[in-house]
């Protein structure tokens, strides 16, 4: 039985009472699966009587989640689940859209795609120097292809077969899943290398994340503090967790690391990963010498989402919303891109006076309310609270990249480029060793590495403006020596709609990356004997997401997964099977 005092238990239950007004998961909050018979998920074996701790814990879970943990529907392994079609509201919003991947060969192709995307106001999901993913309406496809050179008119492949269904399945189910071996919502005080908690079995709305953060701060007051970064445009609090053990009366500036996510509202995996890393450090302090040392030497600021308004909007209205929700000069095009509004090398001219652009950085530097709030908080901490920010991890998705400054241009060479690249390589290696996920490493401008003698001046044009990024502002204006943007899973099979089974694996990968960062920051000043590798989190079978291998080419639900009737015949690709074509594997991917 867990070693809790009666006072602690009562305090937890009292806290649960204060937050019992959290909305339950219902259609009022986001699209939910239809109600399912409880018997469908009933246990086949009789259950042993629940112990005192389990009953008390379940009481808290019921108050927090609105449903008993026994009714939670576990989704793992090869178990089959009932199939529910996306509701009419999602069909109406997304059924006419498609996500296309274009393979790039020349700079002229990129330039043509950039110009066409700007003309048609298209939503660029992700881009590398090899491919670009674009979401657009099916009836706009002919117009787009007509603006492109012939080499691109057939160099594309659909990424997601059924966008409304994939959007629908990214929301949590109303039939919650059972806990694993009695584990529940509350953090465990027992030592365990496996972070298993129902909080990470699904993506969570802001109405759950906020109380969860308060609960952590109340349970671990010795090294966790709930703080506020500021307020959003719509008046929501921007909460954060400060994790660390600062020595009393220490005159030296407190070295601090910021780990943030959710600048772009639809990138849910970044939000969940910030929470996962915070939870792992918080619950392991005092049980692990390396982690205890890390939290005694540094403070960590965890900001799950700097864009709470946009995040709420993705749960309540539009799952694929990117920007914040502030007003612009065009009432029908609200929102500013919070990663294009920072004051360093802000390039508002790149999007002109077009608030409808997905990368619109506002009409002036720091036009984005939430970015301005974070910048003000950082300045206040530095000038008034003796804080020195030494590292910044900005979590995004997708494309699996570790990016370092500069983003706005490839021409300036960061003064500590070799160290930036060395640490970035270590981060990518830690991720690869966790689950064999390959992350590329480069400057954010995708220009050059430290091993090159000079900048490549013939790099491809950028698909969108790269000025005004948080990455560059923290590095240049704040003096954060180790500033990175991590673009998390995946490489395009699901894009921003990454299935929930990836939450824990991605969290473990980034936690291990933070361990590498910590080791690097501590250096060799008396910390050589710490066994960092022993703290790495490993994946078990339950963590491994089910990946479509493309071996099943059968039609499902009476639909042809290769239906391309919306593509004009003259633009269709006749090369159905090219082993050297990246798109072939995506075309073969089984429909979800």
UniProtKB/Swiss-Prot annotation:
Residues 548-558 have a biased composition (Acidic residues). Residues 22-174 form a propeptide. Disulfide bonds join 333-356. Residues 559-575 have a biased composition (Basic and acidic residues). The keyword Manganese does not apply. This is Inactive metallocarboxypeptidase ECM14. GO terms for biological process: cell wall organization; proteolysis. It comes from Blastomyces gilchristii (strain SLH14081) (Blastomyces dermatitidis). Inactive carboxypeptidase that may play a role in cell wall organization and biogenesis. One of its GO terms (molecular function) is zinc ion binding. Zn(2+) binds at residues 264, 267, 396.
């Amino acid at each position: 039985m867990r070693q809790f005092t009666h006072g602690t238990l009562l305090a937890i239950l009292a806290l649960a009472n204060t937050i019992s007004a959290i909305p339950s998961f219902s259609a009022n909050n986001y699209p939910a699966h239809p109600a399912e018979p409880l018997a469908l998920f009933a246990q086949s074996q009789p259950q042993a009587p629940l112990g005192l701790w389990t009953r008390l814990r379940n009481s808290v879970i019921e108050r927090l989640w609105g449903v008993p943990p026994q009714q939670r529907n576990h989704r793992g392994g090869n178990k089959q689940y009932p199939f529910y079609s996306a509701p009419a509201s999602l069909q109406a919003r997304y059924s006419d859209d498609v996500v296309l991947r274009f393979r790039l060969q020349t700079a002229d192709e990129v330039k043509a795609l950039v110009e066409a995307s700007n003309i048609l106001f298209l939503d660029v999901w992700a881009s590398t120097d090899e491919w670009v993913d674009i979401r657009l309406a099916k009836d706009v496809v002919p117009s787009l292809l007509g603006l492109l050179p012939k080499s691109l008119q057939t160099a594309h492949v659909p990424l997601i077969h059924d966008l409304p269904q994939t959007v629908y399945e990214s929301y949590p189910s109303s039939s919650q899943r059972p806990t694993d071996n009695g584990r529940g919502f509350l953090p465990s005080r027992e030592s365990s290398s496996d972070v298993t908690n129902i909080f990470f079995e699904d993506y969570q709305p802001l109405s759950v994340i906020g109380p969860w953060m308060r609960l952590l701060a109340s349970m671990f007051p010795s090294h966790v503090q709930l703080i506020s970064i500021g307020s959003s445009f719509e008046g929501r609090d921007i909460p954060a967790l400060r994790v660390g053990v600062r020595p009393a009366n220490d005159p030296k500036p407190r070295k601090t690391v910021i780990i943030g996510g959710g600048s772009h509202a639809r990138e849910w995996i970044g939000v969940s990963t910030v929470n996962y890393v915070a939870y792992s450090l918080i619950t392991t302090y005092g049980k692990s010498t390396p982690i205890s040392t890390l939290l005694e030497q540094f403070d960590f600021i965890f900001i799950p989402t700097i864009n709470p308004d946009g995040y709420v909007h993705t749960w309540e209205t539009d799952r694929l919303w990117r920007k914040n929700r502030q007003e612009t000069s065009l009432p029908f095009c609200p929102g500013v891109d919070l990663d294009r509004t920072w004051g360093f090398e802000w390039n508002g001219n790149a999007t002109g006076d077009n608030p409808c652009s997905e990368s619109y950085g506002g009409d002036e530097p720091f036009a984005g309310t939430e970015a301005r709030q974070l910048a003000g908080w950082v300045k206040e901490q530095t000038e008034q609270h003796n804080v020195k920010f030494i590292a910044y991890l900005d979590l995004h998705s997708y494309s699996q990249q570790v990016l370092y400054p500069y983003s706005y241009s490839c021409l300036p060479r960061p003064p500590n480029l070799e160290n930036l690249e060395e640490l970035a390589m270590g981060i990518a290696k830690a991720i690869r060793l966790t689950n064999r996920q390959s992350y590329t490493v480069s400057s954010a401008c995708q220009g050059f590495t430290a091993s090159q003698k000079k900048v490549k001046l013939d790099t491809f044009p950028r698909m969108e403006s790269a000025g005004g990024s948080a990455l560059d502002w923290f590095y240049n204006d704040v003096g954060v020596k180790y500033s990175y943007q991590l673009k998390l899973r995946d490489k395009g099979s699901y894009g921003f709609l990454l299935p929930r089974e990836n939450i824990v694996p991605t969290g473990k990968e980034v936690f291990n990356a933070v361990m590498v960062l910590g080791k690097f920051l501590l250096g060799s000043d008396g910390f050589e004997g710490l066994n960092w590798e022993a703290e790495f989190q490993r994946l078990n079978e339950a963590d491994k997401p089910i990946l479509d291998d493309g071996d099943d080419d059968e039609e499902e639900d009476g639909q042809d997964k290769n239906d391309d009737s919306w593509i004009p015949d003259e633009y269709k690709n006749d090369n159905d099977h090219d082993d050297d074509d990246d798109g072939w594997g995506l075309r073969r991917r089984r429909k979800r």
